Amino acid sequence: MSEVSVLLLAVILDLLIGEPPHRLHPVVWMGSAVEWMRNILGNSRISGIILTIAVAAPFTLPLFLINHLQDPLNLIISSILLSAVISIRMLVTSALEVGGSLKEDIEDARRKLSMLVSRDTTSLSDEQITSAAIETLTENITDSVTAPIFYFILLGLPGAFLYRVVNTLDAMVGYLDSENRDIGWFPARLDDILNYIPSRITGVLMVPAALLLGMNWRGSFRILLRDARRTPSPNSGFTMAAAAGALSVQLEKPGVYVLGDPCDGLDNEKLLDAVKLSSLTLILFTLAAAGVMLVIP
C-alpha cells in the first residue's frame, strides 16, 4: 500500500463527503471518552497524564493491525479513517456559512460563529464577526488538517489519530480555570509541542500561496515574522499572522491580541479571500507531504 495514495484519497474523500455521521465520528468518540474518563480521575497533573494515555491507547494501538490487511482493503480502510480526522470541507463550509449569513442576518451570523469560537459573539459587529471567522479558519487549518497529515507522514495512521486525541483533550480540558488547570496541564503542553512544527510550516506556506493568488505576499511574510508570537498560544499566531498580512487586514481578539496593520475595514470579500488563501495553502501542504513521502519511503 502506498501512503501517498492513502493521503490523496483521504483528502478527496473529505472534500467530496465531509465529516462522518456524528455517531460514527472518531473525534466525537474521543470527546465522549474524555468526558467519561475525567469523571473517574481526580483533578491533578498526574490525572492529566493518565487521561491522555487512557484515551490515546484505544484510538491508536488497534490501528497498527490495519497494516496486516491486504490491498485494496488496507488502502480503503486507511483512507476512510484518515479522512475522518481531517476537516477541510467543514472548515471552508463553516466560514462561508458565517459570511453568507452576515449579508442578510447578523444575528444568524453571530449564532453560527458562536459554534466555532469560544468568545462571546452576542454583540460583535460585522467587522468583528468577519475577523473572528478569518481567525478561526486560518488557525484551525493547522489543528484540523496540516498537523494530522504531518503526523501521518511521521507515524502513519496511529500518528494522525494520536494527534487528534491530544488536540481534542486540549480543546476540552486545556484551560486555565480552576476546574481544568491541573488535569489539562499535560494535554495542553503536549498539544503545544505537537503543533510547533506543523503551525510554522503552514504559516510559511501561506506566503507562496498569497503570491500565487496575487495577494500581498510581502506583507504576509513581514507580518508573519512580526506578529506570529503575539497570541497567547505559541502556535496559533503563525497562520493567523501570515493570513492577516496576505489579506492586508488587521485581525483582533479584543483584549487578547492584534495581528496585522490597521486597515480600512473587513468585509465579506476578505473572508472569501481567506477561504481561497487557506484552500491553496492546504493544497500546497498536501502536495509537499506527498512529495516527501515519495522521496523518503
Curated annotation (Swiss-Prot):
UniProt entry tagged with the keyword Cell membrane: yes
Topology of the protein relative to the lipid bilayer: Multi-pass membrane protein
Main subcellular localisation: membrane
GO MF annotations in UniProt: ABC-type vitamin B12 transporter activity; threonine-phosphate decarboxylase activity
Pathway(s) annotated for this protein in UniProt: Cofactor biosynthesis; adenosylcobalamin biosynthesis
Gene Ontology cellular-component terms listed: plasma membrane
Transmembrane segments: 46-66, 72-92, 141-161, 193-213, 277-297
Keyword Transmembrane among UniProt keywords: yes
Keywords: Cell membrane, Cobalamin biosynthesis, Membrane, Transmembrane, Transmembrane helix
Location(s) in or outside the cell: Cell membrane
GO biological process, one term: cobalamin biosynthetic process
HAMAP family, alphabetized: CobD_CbiB
Family from the record: Belongs to the CobD/CbiB family.
The protein's role, per its UniProt record: Converts cobyric acid to cobinamide by the addition of aminopropanol on the F carboxylic group.
Name of this protein: Probable cobalamin biosynthesis protein CobD
Species whose genome carries this gene: Methanothermobacter thermautotrophicus (strain ATCC 29096 / DSM 1053 / JCM 10044 / NBRC 100330 / Delta H) (Methanobacterium thermoautotrophicum)
